[in-house]
């Protein structure tokens, strides 16, 4: 009991520190929820959350430009959002545990850029800075992600940059989503493909 109480108090203190970066209604942040700001900007709102939403996830903002928006009455389980650009999750969305939503490539396709990336990380780290404090993002492809209302993302999925998950769409567990998923369909696999179209009686009117 005492250990659980300690964990709860520590989480509350962490959430209070992070509150300057968050705009939210009456939504709830579970004790395991966390935000990692690799290059924090003190006067910026990084995360906007609507009402009646539950967040039990980890969000990493790779740069000052990142922004995550979550709508009303959504649930994000123990998943990881990695944002440099923009990730939008609309209303009534379920995201299960173990999924990763990633709006950029992290590194260039050119090996020479990656070599310089490693050297710059070492320089920054040895100076006591964030290891990506001076990362060259200009050579890294990044595109926003949109997950529309009433979608459901199963466990252990990977959603990559530039993807739109359509309204009411379902992504099966363990899928790797590299392309858009149409409204009211079920997609699965690696890479994810549409495997079923939901009937009219399962669609929102």
Pin down the residues of each PLM region.
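A generic "structured core" feature
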Residues: 166, 170, 175-176
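Extracellular carbohydrate recognition
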Residues: 163
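Domain-scale signature associated with acetyltransferase and cell-envelope carbohydrate enzymes
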Residues: 1-150, 156-159, 167, 183, ...
């Amino acid at each position: 009991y005492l250990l659980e109480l300690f964990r709860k108090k520590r989480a509350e203190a962490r959430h209070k520190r992070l509150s300057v970066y968050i705009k939210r209604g009456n939504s709830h942040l579970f004790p395991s929820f966390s935000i990692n700001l690799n290059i924090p900007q003190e006067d910026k709102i990084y995360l906007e959350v609507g009402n009646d939403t539950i967040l039990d996830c980890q969000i990493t903002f790779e740069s000052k430009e990142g922004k995550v928006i979550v709508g009303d009455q959504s649930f994000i389980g123990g998943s990881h959002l990695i944002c440099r650009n923009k990730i939008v999750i609309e209303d009534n969305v379920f995201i299960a545990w173990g999924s990763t939503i990633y709006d950029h490539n992290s590194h260039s396709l050119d090996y020479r850029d990656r070599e310089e990336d490693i050297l710059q990380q070492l320089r920054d780290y040895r100076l006591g800075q964030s290891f990506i404090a001076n990362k060259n993002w200009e050579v890294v492809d990044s595109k926003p992600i949109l997950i529309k209302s009433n979608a459901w993302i199963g466990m252990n999925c990977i959603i990559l940059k530039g993807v739109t998950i359509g309204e009411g769409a379902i992504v099966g567990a363990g899928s790797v989503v590299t392309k858009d998923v149409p409204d009211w369909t079920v997609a699965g696999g690696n890479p994810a493909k549409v495997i079923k179209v939901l009937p009219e009686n399962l669609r929102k009117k």
